[in-house]
């Protein structure tokens, strides 16, 4: 008989129907042998999340697009890292207070370290949303140099100013060289799988290309990257590692990372 009391966790976002967070988390808790439920809830505004957590007795939540930044103002508190990043993808109930945390940056760093050394490398970061903010934070934390590119120049400049790093105009990507390209925008995400944020030829100046999108497993950007002799990195590792850190925060237990990864890969192969 387990000493672990039943807990209820959830995913909040819009949309959530495509998300593999529920099967990944359920597989993890099943493997761990703990009584946990994990459900997905589509909400229209970030403001709805906190009342739903309280009314449904949800003790931990994953927050996905488009609410990672907007949800901050409704929380009782946020961790120092989440406050610095300016985005929350994880909420934990600590003694009745709902605390915001960010595990996206941890997922990104762990995934990058599986492929490349971060310290001393230059990273071109596409986008200026919550995932981009986590990426910039993680790269700087590990001694890398991020350079931000965003189609809306003002948002890119604001992000660069917040982290004291560089932002360049989107058109400058064609001639920009970096060790790693990190793509954090939704362009290319299912069902829009035949879109890419960049022309294939623009990838010639990068060694590694990481797409934060995990569905599809191989985005058009990653297919183009391979054709341009870059090393492609799918968003699966990032997704699994950030989820594993959520589980550690919520339960205090070691998550079964290999089981989680296999669950995600199996689900993607069926699509």
Predicted regions: what they are:
Residues 39, 147, 233:
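Conserved beta-strand positions in the Rossmann-like core of class I SAM-dependent methyltransferases
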Residues 207-257, 261-263:
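Rossmann-fold NAD(P)-binding glycine/threonine-rich loop
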Residues 142-163:
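NAD(P)-binding Rossmann-fold cofactor-contacting core
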Residues 63-72, 129-131, 186-189, 215:
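Short glycine-rich anion-binding loops that position phosphate/pyrophosphate groups of nucleotides
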Residues 13, 102, 112, 116-140, ...:
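Glycine-rich adenosine-cofactor-binding loop
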Residues 2-116:
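Phosphate/diphosphate ligand-binding glycine-rich loop within oxidoreductases
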Residues 161-232:
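Rossmann-like adenosine-cofactor binding region
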